[in-house]
């Protein structure tokens, strides 16, 4: 069985978490046999997988990046990210347990890490690339967490924070799993909000999104031409040059907005919802191991 995980040109905490988490929970479980594909963390339930390949779904979500996949006998579901995913796929809502990143609770002791930061901010990885959020955080007096850092460094910085403000969905998901209060920054593109609501639905959680402006001229320009692919590519391709020409100028209004958001109380799903979701995932993890140990034994 091969593990499938999205990997772009730049590392991204939510996607890299797959490689970190599953090698700890399922050591020696995966190989390069693509006849069976393991789908874990992420909005990776696409419609373009080989229809003859067996897809094993373990906490993934539907993100709307393709049409919904046609579910047939080659799809096996242990659980999915949320109620919307279950609805779109036409499977029983009882499969909606939560994002499998919650299983980080089984591999990481956040309580053993000393709290050092009153508030930390984690942008979306594209915002980290094109924006100047490290400078915004410096001016706002808020600790900066880069989603492109190695997984364990991000986990350490989240654990060392009293509160996390995050534009990155897995910044909030993992903060919630580790019981670190968080606030969510509203995604600029409305289409990116559905996956947040999907995750929250499994935990009976209402997300109180905060809007925030662009950090610099690159992000402001990209926001204005978001629907024009040609112009958007031109701006993002030249982002370093634009920042150089503008002296890496950041918008003071965004600094103030981030400070205001940081002063608000953090959110958390209920302890009961989190413990229940985690325990159900552990049961499914045991079932997965049993199911495939039996199949391996039958082949031998």
From Swiss-Prot:
Cited Pfam families: PS_pyruv_trans
EC number: 2.5.1.98
UniProt keyword terms in alphabetical order: Exopolysaccharide synthesis, Pyruvate, Transferase
Biological process according to GO: polysaccharide biosynthetic process
Enzyme class: transferase
Example GO molecular function: transferase activity
Reaction equation(s) it catalyzes: [4)-beta-D-GlcA-(1->4)-2-O-Ac-beta-D-GlcA-(1->4)-beta-D-Glc-(1->4)-[3-O-(CH3CH(OH)CH2C(O))-(R)-4,6-CH3(COO(-))C-beta-D-Gal-(1->3)-beta-D-Glc-(1->4)-beta-D-Glc-(1->4)-beta-D-Glc-(1->6)]-2-O-Ac-alpha-DGlc-(1->](n) + n phosphoenolpyruvate = [4)-beta-D-GlcA-(1->4)-2-O-Ac-beta-D-GlcA-(1->4)-beta-D-Glc-(1->4)-[3-O-(CH3CH(OH)CH2C(O))-(R)-4,6-CH3(COO(-))C-beta-D-Gal-(1->3)-(S)-4,6-CH3(COO(-))C-beta-D-Glc-(1->4)-beta-D-Glc-(1->4)-beta-D-Glc-(1->6)]-2-O-Ac-alpha-DGlc-(1->](n) + n phosphate
Pathway field: Exopolysaccharide biosynthesis
Null allele phenotype: Mutants form aberrant non-nitrogen-fixing nodules on peas.
Function: Catalyzes the pyruvylation of subterminal glucose in the exopolysaccharide (EPS) repeating unit.
Family: Belongs to the polysaccharide pyruvyl transferase family.
Protein name: Exopolysaccharide glucosyl ketal-pyruvate-transferase
Species of origin: Rhizobium leguminosarum bv. viciae
